[in-house]
Amino acid sequence: MIEPRSVVELLQTLVRIPSVNPHGDPGTEGVGEGEIADWLALFLIGLGAKVELREVLPGRPNVVARWPAPGKPRLLFAPHTDTVSVGGMTIDPFGGEVRDGRVWGRGASDTKGPMAAMLWALRESRERLTQLSHEIWFAGLMSEETDQHGSRALAAQERFDFVIAAEPTGLDVVYAHKGSAFFNLTTRGRAGHASRPDLGDNAIAKMLDVLAVIRTEFAAEFAQQRDPVLGASTLSIGTIRGGTKTNVIPDTCEASVDMRFVPAHYQPEIIQRFHRRLEQVCPGIEVSAIPAPPLYTDPAHPLIAKLGECGAQPIGAPWFCDACYFAERGMPAVALGPGSIEQAHTRDEWIAVADLEKGVDFFRRFLARL
């Protein structure tokens, strides 16, 4: 491998390795995290780490590295290696071009830029990593963008005393975010000619009854659940699809609902109650849910204080990330990294070189305080 000479060259290398999450329409044939995991493994070995590739799904591993310091508390740096689709991008998604003081390409902000800043700080600190107060771990987590298989797997395998998930937070420390549940709903009926609706069973009409209950009963409940940092729980109807022609009674209708819970509101019982209520409104409705827990780590945690000494302000975020799966298992976790979340998933994604270099300086100073 060609050794990068700067954090910018490191990020260019990472961007040029396609690692698009294969879920949905990736927009390219270069999917999966296998190639970038292999590259990271070699880079980390060069930094003196003990490295494992832990396969989570076929050909899609987590890359897990540590600088052994037995008996010390464990600190994990945890960026994700996958990106969202490159479909519709207005720039070369894998070009890694440096232009106008920015590095351009898919993942430059989310989250190969923060990953590069972490890695370069570890590289610059490599001679003393085993002498710090904590045993240092690094994990490139697969599949954060869909179902978070990588973080779920590692959180089940290992215990850490503190986790920093890499996200573009402007170098502020996200200690709290909402939980979520993405629901897919399907109602079924019987097709027929629209001139004889009495002979059919309209699946869209059934879905409208379901959505009316969601908007009245559940939306009102969510609006009353508030957090001083994160605001209110929210509920949004995201998509609805049904019917083939105006003169055909639709036999299928699908809708999706996005729920976001403040930490005190998130309970498995709410998801179960939602399912039961929809079944009452429309017997036989098909409901599937993809839940993610909220994140909350005490902002008075000593390592959050050390992050604060480096300039990070404690904040909440409306989105969710891999940190929540470690927190769910009792491990203090936060999200932090250079760059802006507003650049994540955009058609012309970039990160400013100045922000990238600030990220390296931030993580280097943080490591020096351990």
Language-model features and meaning:
Residues M1-I2, E52-L57, Y175, F182-L370:
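Metal-dependent amide/peptide-bond hydrolase catalytic core
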Residues L14, P18, L44, E167, ...:
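Residue-level signal for inorganic ion chemistry
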Residues P58-R60, D147, G170-L171, F320:
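Short acidic loop-to-helix transition motifs that present clustered carboxylates
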Residues L75-F77, A139, F162-I164, P332-V334:
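Hydrophobic/aromatic beta-strand patches that form the interior of the parallel beta-sheet core
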